[in-house]
Amino acid sequence: MKGNPMQPTIISCAVTGSAPTPEKNPAVPVTPAEIAESAIEAAKAGAAIVHCHVRDPVTTNPTMNIDLYRDVTERIRRSGVDVILNLTTGPGARFSPCDHDAGIASKDSQMCLPAERVQHVIELRPEICSLDVVTMNRRRHVFLNHPDHLKEMSAAIQTAGVKPELEVFDTGHILNAISLIEDGFIESPQFFQFCLGIDFGAPATVEAIVMMKNMLPKDAIWSAFGISRFQFPMVAAAVLLGGHVRVGLEDNIYLEKGVLAPSNAALVTKAARIINDLGGSVASVAQARDLLSLSR
């Protein structure tokens, strides 16, 4: 299932991440109440999946505080809005070496053991969690996911009954994911997310999507997103190539050139319009669960 242009398109909304800050766009949610409310608004606008990080309410910096994850999760669940919750496991994999010893992590590093990175997933049991099947250079650090750590995290996620969203930033990461699949750590149908336009990863181009989707296992389901100005062009490309899409303030803070997005819901609304204008349809939450083989 490498893409079917006739199927309904799942919209994921990445509500808040690590980089965008309220200083860049006041709409970026920070507190658990803001994150949950923004996720709920995005769901009402058409997002079947909401992908959530948490931030320190005082510093606005990304954090792995499980109490904040719990607060966000409970607020969304209490709202009565039906949406698929996707919690990140990305934090805890940032490494930069000390100037005096490359084998020692600098104070800017944030490295955690696998059990710490999935603790909130085990306790809160979202339907989906992200799994970054990737090691790559970034501007100031290495995004470092050791193969043994990925196996340990995958096993814990599988035992918890949570579906991993396999985030891949380049073609080699797909081969890494396939290795996990062949070793029995990832069940079918796999859900891949192509993360495009990020420094030193695959570019946000049609050619990159075609190459990456052609490498997937036959039953895999895929989605794609582009960061910043590439967000909406990649929505159109993914729809036309039979995939699903992701938008949100984690990846892009603009609604159009020079116009800040007033909310995550506004980005979802624009993505839904593109899908419909191209002759497609937006997947309901029930349809998304069916496509992803989720059992609620």
Locate predicted features.
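Histidine-centered catalytic micro-motifs
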Residues: 13, 32, 36-37, 47-59, ...
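Alpha-helix-loop-beta-strand connector modules within alpha/beta enzyme cores
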Residues: 60-89, 152-159, 211-219, 265-275
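Catalytic alpha/beta core domains of metabolic enzymes, predominantly
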Residues: 127-250, 261-266
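Mid-to-C-terminal alpha-helical segments outside catalytic/metal-binding sites
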Residues: 269, 273-296
